[in-house]
Swiss-Prot record:
Expressed at high levels in testis and at lower levels in brain, lung, ovary, spleen, thymus and uterus. May function as an output molecule from the suprachiasmatic nucleus (SCN) that transmits behavioral circadian rhythm. May also function locally within the SCN to synchronize output. Potently contracts gastrointestinal (GI) smooth muscle. Induction: Activated by CLOCK and BMAL1 heterodimers and light; inhibited by period genes (PER1, PER2 and PER3) and cryptochrome genes (CRY1 and CRY2). This is Prokineticin-2. Keywords: Biological rhythms, Disulfide bond, Neuropeptide, Secreted, Signal. GO terms for biological process: angiogenesis; chemotaxis; circadian rhythm; endothelial cell proliferation; negative regulation of apoptotic process; neuropeptide signaling pathway; positive regulation of smooth muscle contraction; spermatogenesis. The gene is Prok2. The keyword ATP-binding does not apply. One of its GO terms (molecular function) is G protein-coupled receptor binding.
Amino acid sequence: MEDPRCAPLLLLLLLPLLLTPPAGDAAVITGACDKDSQCGGGMCCAVSIWVKSIRICTPMGQVGDSCHPLTRKVPFWGRRMHHTCPCLPGLACLRTSFNRFICLARK
């Protein structure tokens, strides 16, 4: 390894080891939950849009927000299967077109 041409090759081989974080570092997900009771008022524990195996505290639907008609009321003691929470009290999840539901004032 005394050949000066080997230095760039050695650096290239060692660079991934130098840039890799130590094992044990992990992403911290804020707002992670297992059930509604772990979330604050006006929120529910819904499936993450990005990682389906994770549930996060999500705001309940306001007027005009997309919703799912089968989303259970808060608090729900089981595990939610949708990424949306139910609409806020006084609102209903109503169909606006073939495959679209939004939170609207109850009549």
